[in-house]
Amino acid sequence: GGLEDTETLGVLARTHKDLGLGARDPALRSKHLEAAFRLYERAYASSRQRGAAGGAYYTGINAATVAVLRGELDEARWIAAEVADVCHAAVDVAADPAIEYWRRATLGEAALILGDAPAAARHYAAAMALAQGRYGDLSTTRRQSRLLAQHLPVDDEWLDEALSIPPVLVFTGHMVDQVGRAASRFPAALEGAVQPAIRAAIAAMRPLASYGSAACGADILCLEAVRELGGETHVVLPFPAEEFRRTSVEIAAGDWGARFDRLLEHADSVTITSDHRASGSAAPFEYANLVLTGLGRLRAQVLDTALRGLAVWDRGSGGESGGSASV
């Protein structure tokens, strides 16, 4: 019946595995890990019997991983060697890159369990080349490899580099000075010097995604640089775009308005944190700053990668509420 298909057995096994890893009581941990192993083992045997290679190496490598977690290294290595054979027999030069990614990642995990670090590194490198920006898949593989390394007699220092995921960027910075501003912070004449400095800083990080606002000046320069370098741009505005454009973009001379429009049109997401502007209050800006930093932090945590910050501001300025210094 439905309870015997590979996918259902895999979900049940994953649930027991997670419960086991989260259990503080050793007896409860052992109980859940044993249940996970039996379910993965059953699904693996069923997939092999049906000749379903994909299901076989998915459930098989998970059975081997749970065996490692249970301290059954001989059994883990026996299963891992068998899974590696299944993967090698399943080579398909016309395979979808996503399918081939998991075959290669599985070979990497099998090699790790078998104690063959050079082979693991080769397979992980091949998987990385096939990932094509699917950072969720990469983070899953990275977590699994770290989990294995914690329970195996292997040197794991190379794993983070072998399965590296670009960082997430949160940026902030001053707006270009409004005409007639008494205390200058970002004179329009400095754009030509600031722009390449921002691009160089972002190019050194190569973020997969960025989170920030879109005011004239540093925000727009950061968004343009990230987009030019191929990263995602996620814009967070404190109130609707039309009003934000009027109050935080068009205040400076130049083509900031047109650049703002282009960036919002091509942004991966635009989040509006309030449906109106509270005139005279910094609260909408403070809240938007909390949201954009929170979104960046959450994305970094989900992908198990670093969170980086970039600020373009005058350290000598007071740092008004809701301004650059508050991020």
Residue ranges and their predicted role:
Residues 137-163:
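Terminal, low-structured helical/coil segments at or just beyond the last alpha-helical repeat
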Residues 11, 15-18, 62, 106-113, ...:
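"A position-specific structural signal for the A-helix of alpha-solenoid helical repeats
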Residues 18, 22-25, 69, 73, ...:
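Alpha-solenoid helical repeat scaffolds
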